[in-house]
């Protein structure tokens, strides 16, 4: 299974679960290649442990500092409402965290789709 996530720099990246490792995690292969180019995906890095059981989440207040690799870590919003990194994460593992599916007026979704591309 692969999925695409927007990171702090708004670059789409492919994430794949690592089920063979002792501590399973998502692996990021970034950046996505230009469709016109034949360059392969590269630079894998463990990001999140699989036990987070996240399906999706949104965040709009992002920390200014990136990780060592220059990638923003995926955002997770915990039951306590803590916000971490990135904008949108779709992770097809199991459960969702309480309150994660709640949408107030859909304004957040519109902000994502209406964000200008640079």
UniProtKB/Swiss-Prot annotation:
- Ranges of Low complexity composition bias in the record: 28-39
| Tissue expression pattern | Mainly expressed in placenta.
Region of interest (Disordered), ranges: 1-39
Q: What is this protein called?
A: Down syndrome critical region protein 4
- Source organism: Homo sapiens
Give the source lineage, highest ranks first: Eukaryota, Metazoa, Chordata, Craniata, Vertebrata
Gene symbol of the encoding locus: DSCR4
């Amino acid at each position: 299974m692969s999925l695409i996530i927007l990171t702090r720099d708004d670059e789409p990246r492919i994430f794949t679960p690592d089920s063979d490792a002792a501590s399973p995690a998502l692996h990021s292969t970034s950046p996505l290649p230009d469709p016109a180019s034949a360059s392969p995906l590269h630079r894998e890095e463990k990001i999140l442990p699989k036990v987070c059981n996240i399906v999706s989440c949104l965040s709009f207040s992002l920390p200014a500092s990136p990780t060592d690799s220059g990638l923003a870590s995926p955002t997770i919003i915990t039951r306590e409402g803590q916000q971490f990194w990135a904008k949108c994460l779709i992770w097809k593992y199991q459960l969702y965290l309480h309150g994660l599916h709640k949408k107030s007026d859909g304004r957040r979704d519109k902000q994502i789709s209406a964000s200008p591309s640079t």
